[in-house]
């Protein structure tokens, strides 16, 4: 009986997880992305970033300055970032929006993700 209850709870959780992702909209073009972020801050714990329409990224993360460049290529947000003195490799990311938060998924949507509140 305990196994059936656990299995049912697991199935319900998996279905709910699918519903959460289904509520996200993929951002597919530069103008939609810019309308969401330009003149706003992207925030998460210890990180505050600004993205400009001129293709620049600036802000702070964990007490270090962040600078970088970005472009929109083939439906993906592609960026280079310098975090303090450390250069993060060039990466193109899938971007989704759930109405409150932007989620960036590295490696063209196949890698790790980070969600940011828009303020």
Which residue ranges define each predicted feature?
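Lipid interaction determinants
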Residues: 2, 18-119
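Bacterial N-terminal signal peptides that target proteins for export
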Residues: 1-10
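Bacterial N-terminal signal peptides
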Residues: 9-17
């Amino acid at each position: 009986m305990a196994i059936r209850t656990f299995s049912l709870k697991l199935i319900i959780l998996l279905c709910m997880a699918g519903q959460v992702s289904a509520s996200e909209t993929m951002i597919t073009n530069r103008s939609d992305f810019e309308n969401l972020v330009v003149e706003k801050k992207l925030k998460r714990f210890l990180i505050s970033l600004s993205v400009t329409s001129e293709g620049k990224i600036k802000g702070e993360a964990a007490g270090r300055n962040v600078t970088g460049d970005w472009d929109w290529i083939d439906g993906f947000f592609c960026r280079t970032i310098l975090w303090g003195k450390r250069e993060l490799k060039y990466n193109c990311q899938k971007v989704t929006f759930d109405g409150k938060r932007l989620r960036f998924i590295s490696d063209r949507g196949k890698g790790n993700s980070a969600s940011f509140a828009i303020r």
